[in-house]
């Protein structure tokens, strides 16, 4: 059997040693790297060859990749690397890795072109100065062959182990049983269309209400698609920590179902084939190798029927009609071609896999069966760096942090132990890391290369420098992306592709910066002040980012890189943070287009004095503000084989298709939920206006409506207002006019303990009204079943405030889509309303009431955005 791996992946495995060292930072962004490569190759002569596809093999290891360039006139192969800072300060182990890659490419080129010798060059391109530094070696073809073979031999055992894992994983996932006795209402349709998306290689928007089991209903078919040869990896992306916990619980449930079936006591009556297989078998030869080192002749056999279930035929699920069914012929998965960047699997030295722990997820899973074979599925939880770092006061290099010292020398043992455990949540990764004295955060990043399901925040795939996106590109993974609570992605993506630069922070950085940074900071401040002098209004929108300001920021970043490489501890954290802010700002300014606006906000007088400006001297805040993240997200969707965005609130579908950059032909599924209109009484208080101008007059009728409802049916209620001020005034009036009503309210800046205390008052048999701001922490993502919550009062349409910034965003949306008001105000506002109202009915047994308090709820354009199953009175 032959195992295929990319040049880069193999060299990162075989040639990395020594310390983890992040002093050579801030590194160029991926966009800067692409631009840098283009500049270097554009300077070469006409005969210069670019992006040369190369392949070769030794023993059972097949290697593929693309060399950056070859100059036939000089007989020189070039490996191009972008950097910023002082090249002489680059860590030796970084340089060794670069040479390893270049020499492997050199051998592959010699073999392909029958060359007797070759000059191999590392071309380092400074993204700030645009200078090239070229290092060369001249080798005979024989010496390059010897180098190549030595790397392959070091990699072979690891690759063979990964092949065995992949074969076992796919075999298990092909017959993975559904973990419940039957599908919930709507869950079958959701699972079927998710599977079709993976099978056909397309995106899907799925609106699915609370109560149908969305997490299991999306993970299960994606895993079956892996087993059937359509996918290599599954990414489960969430907006908040509770979403990660639900995904990990669902994966534990699926593990338990597998173990129960393996032991002859299936966890559920619905079979795997019934739940996720397609009427069309995957084509023979479907690649099961793209994630690294699998046999080149591996194919994806048809999933066998599950004898434990009546519904054993593949057609049992996917022949059901749904709004998301594809009318065209299904796209076949990639066949035959192995990944040019495919990483290999766990070391053959790995300990025997342990049984996965018991877990609770959406329903109590069957306990792990003693002696049952555990599901050969590696699941990894990724968490933020600040939540993983063991030494937050240390710099990330071996001279400062003990967990960075010798990181790559101890990585192999940590990796082998971790991959044998298979379930790699935050606590497990930390335990393994500390046992081997390596950094937990960077161990998790290494484990992402070898994991089958990765659970993490949106930013791990959608951010501009996202880890999972980079790995997917490098390794050419066929990934299935599940985006949980996808209505949150719009605001989160806007944040990812927006950057703020604050002149007050610059002033603080100047006070604390080392002398080596004084000149570039002063130059940046002068250019900034020049911009301030031209500004007449307090808020200004400009067509472009001033080039002089941008150049000054770039030079400051370059100088920071040099100082970081030389003396990283000489830069205080606040100065370093400003440097990273500047780098993010410059990166987005260089990509500025109609998807964003550039605005300048002047701060002066008392506001400036409060921020430390002597005499209230005016300063400003610059912002590259993303409005339409579609332009940045579309390439990420295109890279994935399947992207499924699901949520309880994705209405109207075209709004999310447009703003999130999904293809026009993306099907939309509106899942019928388990709830009946009789469970929820929805009334409109059309005699009240909550508009700003009517705010004072609205207080008394809102309070009387609340008091009347509470007297009619005492219990636990939530009241939602548009602002903390509005909320406070309502609560004060209730306490004044109806002191017998128990009330409590959300405060600004509540910590986790305070939020928990707020929610703790919603208990079975309890009584009272908790007031919160619409769109805040208590308006979504909380689960208060039964009598814990019996009603909600929503005294707002949730429309964003009309101000200069939002009006500029509205204009940008109008220019692109022609529906500026709806896209900026109405649709986002009503999404918050529906999310908040969704707190009331959580199960098929709940009953409750929702009062929509504003005359605008009578309007047709507003009511069409409410859930179909509601009956509005």
Report each predicted region and the residues it spans.
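Metal-dependent nuclease catalytic cores that hydrolyze phosphodiester bonds in DNA/RNA
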Residues: 1-75, 100
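Conserved catalytic cores of phosphodiester-cleaving nucleases, focusing on short active-site segments
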Residues: 37, 65-91, 105
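Conserved pre-motif I regulatory segment
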Residues: 164-207, 220
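A substrate-engagement module of RecA-like helicase motors
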Residues: 177, 230-281, 349-454, 462, ...
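Signature of the SF2 helicase/ATPase Hel1-core->accessory helical subdomain module
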Residues: 218, 224, 245, 436-453, ...
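A contiguous, basic/glycine-rich beta-loop/short-helix subdomain that forms a polymer-engagement track
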Residues: 429-454, 465-472, 562-689, 697-704, ...
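Conserved RecA-like P-loop NTPase helicase motor core
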Residues: 686-697, 748-856
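Conserved helicase motor "Helicase C" RecA-like lobe of SF1/SF2 P-loop NTPases
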Residues: 722-747
């Amino acid at each position: 059997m032959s195992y295929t791996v990319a040049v880069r992946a193999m060299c990162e495995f075989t040639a990395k040693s020594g310390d983890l060292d992040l002093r050579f930072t801030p590194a160029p962004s991926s966009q800067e790297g692409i631009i840098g490569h283009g500049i270097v190759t554009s300077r070469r002569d006409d005969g210069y060859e670019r992006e040369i596809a190369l392949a070769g093999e030794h023993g059972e290891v097949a290697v593929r990749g693309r060399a950056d360039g070859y100059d036939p006139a000089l007989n020189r192969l070039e490996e191009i690397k972008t950097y910023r800072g002082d090249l002489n300060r680059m860590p030796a182990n970084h340089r060794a890795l670069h040479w390893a890659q270049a020499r492997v490419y050199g051998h592959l080129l010699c073999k392909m072109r029958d060359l007797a010798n070759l000059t191999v060059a590392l071309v380092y391109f400074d993204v700030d100065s645009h200078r090239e530094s070229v290092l060369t070696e001249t080798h005979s073809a024989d010496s390059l062959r010897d180098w190549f073979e030595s790397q392959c031999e070091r990699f072979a055992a690891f690759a063979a182990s990964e092949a065995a894992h992949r074969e076992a994983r796919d075999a298990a996932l092909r017959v993975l049983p559904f973990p419940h006795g039957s599908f919930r209402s709507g869950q079958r349709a959701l699972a079927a269309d998710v599977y079709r998306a993976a099978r056909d290689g397309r995106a899907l928007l799925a609106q699915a209400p609370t109560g149908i089991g969305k997490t299991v209903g999306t993970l299960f078919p994606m895993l079956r698609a892996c087993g059937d040869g359509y996918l290599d990896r599954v990414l489960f992306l969430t907006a908040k920590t509770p979403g990660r916990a639900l995904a990990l619980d669902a994966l534990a449930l699926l593990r338990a179902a597998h173990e129960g079936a393996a032991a002859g006591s299936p966890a559920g009556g619905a079979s795997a084939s019934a739940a996720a297989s397609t009427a069309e078998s995957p084509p023979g030869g479907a690649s099961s190798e793209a994630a690294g080192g699998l046999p080149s002749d591996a194919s994806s056999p048809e999933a066998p029927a599950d004898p434990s279930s009546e519904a054993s035929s593949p057609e049992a699920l996917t022949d059901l009609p749904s709004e998301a069914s594809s009318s065209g012929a299904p796209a076949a998965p990639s066949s035959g071609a192995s990944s040019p960047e495919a990483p290999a699997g766990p070391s053959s030295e790995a300990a025997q896999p342990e049984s996965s722990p018991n877990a609770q997820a959406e329903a109590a899973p069957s306990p792990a069966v003693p002696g049952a074979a555990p599901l050969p599925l590696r699941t990894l939880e990724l968490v933020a760096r600040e939540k993983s770092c063991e030494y937050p006061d240390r710099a990330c290099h071996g001279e400062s942090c003990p967990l960075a010292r010798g990181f790559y020398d101890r990585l192999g043992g940590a990796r082998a132990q971790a991959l044998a455990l298979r379930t790699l949540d935050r606590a497990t990764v930390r335990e393994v890391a500390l046992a081997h004295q390596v950094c937990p955060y960077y161990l998790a990043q290494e484990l992402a290369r070898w994991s089958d399901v990765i659970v993490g925040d949106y930013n791990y795939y959608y951010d501009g420098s996202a880890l999972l996106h980079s790995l997917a590109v490098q390794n050419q993974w066929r990934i299935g992306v599940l985006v949980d609570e996808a209505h949150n992605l719009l605001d989160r993506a806007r944040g990812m592709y927006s950057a703020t630069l604050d002149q007050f922070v610059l002033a603080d950085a100047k006070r604390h910066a080392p002398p080596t940074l004084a000149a570039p900071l002063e130059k940046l401040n002068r250019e900034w002040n020049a911009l301030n002098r031209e500004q007449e209004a307090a808020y200004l929108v400009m067509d472009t980012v001033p080039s002089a300001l941008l150049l000054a920021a770039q030079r400051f970043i370059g100088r920071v890189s040099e100082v970081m490489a030389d003396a990283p501890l000489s830069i205080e954290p606040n100065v370093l943070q400003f440097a990273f802010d500047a780098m993010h700002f410059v990166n987005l300014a260089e990509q500025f287009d109609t998807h964003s606006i550039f605005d300048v906000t002047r701060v002066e007088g008392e506001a400036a004095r409060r921020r430390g400006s002597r005499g209230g001297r005016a300063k400003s805040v610059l912002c590259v503000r993303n409005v339409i993240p579609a332009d940045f997200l579309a390439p990420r969707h295109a890279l994935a084989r399947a992207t499924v965005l699901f949520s309880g609130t994705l209405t109207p579908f075209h709004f999310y298709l447009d703003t999130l950059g999904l293809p026009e032909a993306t099907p939309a599924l509106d899942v019928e939920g388990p709830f009946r209109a009789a469970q929820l009484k929805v009334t409109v208080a059309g005699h009240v206006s909550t508009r700003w101008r009517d705010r004072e007059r609205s207080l008394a009728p809102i309070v009387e409506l609340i008091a009347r409802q509470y007297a009619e049916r005492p219990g636990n209620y939530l009241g939602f207002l548009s602002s903390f001020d509005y909320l406070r005034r309502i609560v004060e009036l209730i306490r004044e006019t109806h002191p017998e009503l128990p009330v409590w309210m959300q405060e600004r800046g509540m910590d986790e303990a305070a939020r928990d205390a707020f929610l703790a008052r919603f208990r079975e048999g309890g009584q009272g009204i908790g007031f919160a701001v619409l769109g805040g922490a208590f308006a979504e993502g909380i689960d208060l079943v039964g009598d814990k919550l019996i009603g909600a009062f929503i005294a707002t349409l949730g429309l964003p405030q009309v101000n200069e910034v939002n009006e500029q965003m509205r204009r940008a949306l109008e220019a692109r889509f022609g529906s500026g008001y709806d896209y900026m105000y109405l649709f986002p506002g009503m999404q918050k309303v529906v999310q908040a109202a969704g707190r009331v009915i959580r199960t098929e047994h709940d009953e409750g009431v929702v009062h929509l308090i504003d005359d605008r709820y009578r309007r047709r354009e507003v009511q069409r955005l409410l859930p179909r199953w509601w009956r509005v009175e």
